[in-house]
């Protein structure tokens, strides 16, 4: 277990299993309050599995919308547009699994940009391109 806490903007991510610690098999992380909504986007390199720990969430995957509560899980395959939001803004916790590993690097780069004072549209664009994320 990594135990790494990454912060950038209003985002807080606890990395439970990094790509490095799993030999590249997966990344496992938790989004912590005050969670922000994630707009529609596509991953080209990994699948994404959302598991609700706290709060009520709406996960869009393709043309389907799932309203889920603690214990609920939704799978978003790579290449399919998806988004997530909380029913009560700012509340909730999500455990997110992304196989194969590597996606934790996206958050690590944004946290480094925050620490360096360079977090902004250019940092998001560079990290998104590097990690195969297209924002729609």
Give residue spans per PLM region.
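Ligand-binding loop in jelly-roll beta-barrel domains
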Residues: 78-104
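Structural motif
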Residues: 12, 37, 49, 56-58, ...
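A short glycine-rich, His/Asp/Glu-containing loop-to-beta-strand
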Residues: 5-40, 46
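Acidic/histidine-enriched, glycine/proline-rich intrinsically disordered or flexible terminal extensions
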Residues: 108-136
């Amino acid at each position: 277990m990594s135990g790494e806490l990454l912060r950038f903007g209003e985002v807080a991510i606890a990395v439970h299993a990094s790509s490095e610690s799993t030999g590249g098999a997966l990344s496992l992380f938790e989004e912590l309050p005050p969670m922000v909504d994630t707009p529609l986007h596509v991953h080209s390199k990994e699948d994404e599995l959302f598991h609700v720990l706290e709060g009520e969430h709406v996960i869009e995957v393709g043309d389907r919308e799932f309203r889920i509560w603690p214990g609920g899980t939704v799978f978003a395959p790579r290449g399919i547009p998806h988004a997530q939001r909380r029913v009560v803004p700012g509340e909730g916790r999500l455990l997110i699994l992304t196989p194969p590993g590597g996606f934790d690097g996206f958050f690590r780069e944004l946290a480094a940009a925050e620490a360096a004072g360079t977090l902004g549209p250019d940092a998001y664009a560079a990290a998104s391109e590097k990690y195969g994320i297209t924002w729609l």
